[in-house]
Amino acid sequence: MDAYQQVKDKLEELGIEFDVVEHPPAFTTEQADSYIEGLEGVRTKSMFLTNKKKTQYYLLIMDDQKPLDMDDFKEQVEANRIRMASADSLAEKMQLPPGTVSPFGLLNNEEKDIRVYFDKDIVSEEIMTFHPNTNEKTIFIKTQDLFRFLESIGFSYQILTLP
């Protein structure tokens, strides 16, 4: 089963409605945004982060136009050092290549060892956009349905106030 089909099947199983736009591969948030210009939904970026010892992993979802203050984030999650996780860690934990990170990759995290965080600024938005485990599609999903999806696959999440 391809990566998108797995996402589609799970959302349909949960009775979650969503829209999908197919487009050429998007390797940056700017490219992805250009393919869905004019459509409703907050443009997100999903960052897969880890501590220095690679003993803890984090998935942070925030507005794609907002820069991340890594020092503030590490304080809020009570970690000493945080950095972007490697492509190898991403493949190991979510079976995804770089450029396709999203909450849907958590379908592949059987260990349930990734902490999920959302920036408060986006959770009030009705619709969020993500790559559904492929950078050749963008999915539009209601925020509350995304939270329901996460809970259905065994993930809780926290909402942070990022500067």
Predicted features and spans:
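Extended, low-hydrophobicity, polar/charged segments
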Residues: 1-163
